[in-house]
């Protein structure tokens, strides 16, 4: 891939899922930096919390968030994100990455403009579709033997 994203964030309380997703993103060299959070509230605070803009790192290009997590759920994370000013939201592509294919969950996520919905596991093909759609990027996928 010629161009990388600068920063991808994974928000998932499942350590194995986070490890595998991090490994996939690293193997494909999709981003210069990948950050992982097990708690949605910590991720939101770190990314968009109450601090002056000079002390905050640049917004990530892409955030994958699980829906079902203890504490602040993925839905609550989306609510917090949706309350951010529009120019702030436009800096980051938000993608739900979940095992849920329940109609109520997909309908609820569909209420948020510009939020992508992907089912686990994250694969090269799903990532390629997302990158093509939202970033006009193409992975150099090589067949595995």
Region spans (language model):
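C-terminal compact regulatory domains
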Residues: 18, 39, 98-101
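Non-catalytic signal-transmission and effector/linker regions of two-component phosphorelay proteins
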Residues: 1-9, 15-30, 55, 88-91, ...
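Receiver (REC) domain active-site loop signature in two-component systems and cognate sites
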Residues: 69
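Helix N-cap/capping motif at the beta->alpha junctions
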Residues: 36-49, 74
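Conserved sequence signature across two-component system core domains
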Residues: 11-12, 21, 37, 63
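Alpha4 helix (beta4-alpha4-beta5 surface) of REC/receiver domains from two-component response regulators
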Residues: 3, 76, 89-95, 100-118
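Active-site residues of response regulator receiver
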Residues: 66
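Conserved phosphotransfer cores of two-component systems
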Residues: 52, 56-58, 82-90, 112
